[in-house]
Design a protein with these regions (language model features):
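Metal-dependent catalytic neighborhoods of phosphoester/phosphodiester hydrolases
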Residues: 63-69
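Short beta-strand segments at enzyme active-site cores
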Residues: 15, 49-56, 62, 146
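Acidic-leg catalytic submotif of subtilisin-like serine proteases
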Residues: 11-17, 21
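Short, glycine/acidic-enriched loop or turn micro-motifs at the edges of active sites
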Residues: 19, 58, 151
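Active-site-adjacent betaalpha module
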Residues: 1-11, 39-42, 46-47, 69-213
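A short acidic, glycine/proline-enriched capping/turn motif at secondary-structure boundaries
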Residues: 58-60, 99-100
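A short acidic, helix-capping loop that chelates divalent metal ions and anchors anionic groups
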Residues: 21-24, 62-63
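A short alpha/beta connector and helix-capping loop motif
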Residues: 26-56
Length: 213
């Protein structure tokens, strides 16, 4: 289902755009994925909307048929890429599973900000992105998938998620669709998402401007 709207309280979740993962062979140019994720982050920051940056440092402990990497990750493998322009106000979630909500406090943090909708981008479409989308849906969030700001190591996994899974979890849109929707619905916030001087939460100027649009 194509993107129809964004709720007043929407957050962006960027999954696993970290140094070790972007070096893996993916089916779309990783530079394009990074550029679109950065564009989404810039648009959210300009409107004072929350951004969640997710990285992964290992795997869940359960047995699998597919061979698993053993031992610690190389130094710097889990570092978020600098292109995301991480800010002090960004929410950073470190996980050891596919989905960003499992065994983390992400749900509590988002609900503490009254978030009702999430936009999800990142790598890999069929694992980290899909698992995060499934968990967000199960926790009651409206879900939007930025389908041109994600990729996978396997084309069939990427295509299957987009065609068969995502339509059952939420709505899909391109980066341009999502940014256009943000620009049409949300007032520009002069503080970005770096509010200070006691203007956070319900007193945030961005929220006040939105309420009077």
């Amino acid at each position: 289902m194509a993107l129809t709207t964004l709720d007043p309280h929407t957050a962006l979740i960027i999954v696993d755009l970290q140094k070790g993962i972007i070096s893996l062979p993916v089916v779309h140019p990783i530079g394009d994925i990074i550029e679109r994720a950065r564009a989404l982050a810039d648009a959210f920051r300009a409107r004072g909307l929350p951004i969640v940056l997710v990285n992964v440092t290992g795997r869940a402990p359960g047995r699998t048929e597919q061979p698993r990497q053993t031992g610690p990750c190389p130094e710097g493998w889990s570092d978020l890429i600098p292109e995301l322009n991480q800010q002090p106000s960004d929410i950073v979630v470190t996980k050891r599973t596919w989905g960003a909500f499992a065994s983390t406090d992400l749900e509590a943090q988002l609900k503490g900000l009254d978030i009702t909708q999430v936009v999800i981008a990142g790598v890999a479409t069929g694992t980290g992105v899909e698992a995060t989308a499934r968990q967000a849906y199960e926790h009651g969030f409206n879900v939007t998938l930025a389908i041109d700001a994600m990729t996978d190591m396997r084309l069939e996994a990427h295509a299957y998620s987009i065609a068969n899974v995502f339509p059952r979890l939420g709505e899909a849109g391109t980066t341009r669709n999502i940014i256009d929707n943000i620009n049409s619905k949300f007032a520009y916030c002069p503080f970005g998402n770096r509010c200070t001087e006691g203007v956070e939460g319900n007193d945030c100027i961005g929220k006040i401007l939105f309420d009077y649009r």
